[in-house]
Amino acid sequence: MSSKSQLTYGARASKHPNPLAKRLFEIAEAKKTNVTVSADVTTTRELLDLADRLGPYIAVIKTHIDILTDFSVDTINGLNVLAQKHNFLIFEDRKFIDIGNTVQKQYHGGALRISEWAHIINCSVLPGEGIVEALAQTASAQDFPYGPERGLLVLAEMTSKGSLATGEYTKASVDYARKYKNFVMGFVSTRALTEVQSDVSSASEDEDFVVFTTGVNLSSKGDKLGQQYQTPASAIGRGADFIIAGRGIYAAPDPVEAAQRYQKEGWEAYMARVCGKS
């Protein structure tokens, strides 16, 4: 599997075949940030406050919308307004994992109305190829109003201790991503997946999957529930294009200062990589 991680975000944006990935790289280049903040708060007020305060320093805000105790249309409207104001994308970390017919209804419709506001979603391929096919099918339907403004990340690896997302599971993640590359924009993984040998050999010259790495924290190596952290520099050095930081930012004494620090360290690591110094 090829990697274009040595290229700048601007260069990747100029040739990227996926419209949403292209937009994401353009945002990163314009704002000089590769930070995704995981805003794991439990009220709409907290979520929108964080989005507004941290918006200038991030490329993406990641939500777990089902942990909000007061989710409503005001949540959706507020997020959309702030995404436009600060030029960031919204990633709903739903981790879809069910049969195709069910995930189609969970994504486009249902109580959370995810397709209406989340630019990016993710899924596990544990149920098999059908889950990726179903989500891609929904996004490409003629009556789906959001089209190229939506994209999927395949959950290829996890940072939790003892994760079973390894080996054949990760290989299947790459296979399905290649097969449905019009909707799959990349992976959530702990590294670039260049060494994974895919059975789908139809990789085009413009193949350029985006890598998001979770579990980035400057002040901790892990938690009591098995989470294992790495630094922005180590994540970028292993092939991450975008780093995902949660408690290290939103639970800091000064979340804005923390976001700025992650932005600085993430950007410096990226510049070192594209300049051949990583």
From Swiss-Prot:
GO terms for cellular component: cytosol. One of its GO terms (molecular function) is orotidine-5'-phosphate decarboxylase activity. Substrate binds at residues 40, 62-64, 93-102, 229, 247. It comes from Aspergillus fumigatus (strain ATCC MYA-4609 / CBS 101355 / FGSC A1100 / Af293) (Neosartorya fumigata). It comes from the Eukaryota. Its EC number is 4.1.1.23. The active site is at K95. The gene is pyrG. The keyword Lyase applies. NCBIfam families: pyrF. The lineage of its organism: Eukaryota, Fungi, Dikarya, Ascomycota, Pezizomycotina. It is an enzyme of class 4 (lyase). Belongs to the OMP decarboxylase family. PROSITE patterns: OMPDECASE. It catalyses: orotidine 5'-phosphate + H(+) = UMP + CO2. Keywords: Decarboxylase, Lyase, Pyrimidine biosynthesis. This is Orotidine 5'-phosphate decarboxylase. The keyword Transmembrane helix does not apply.
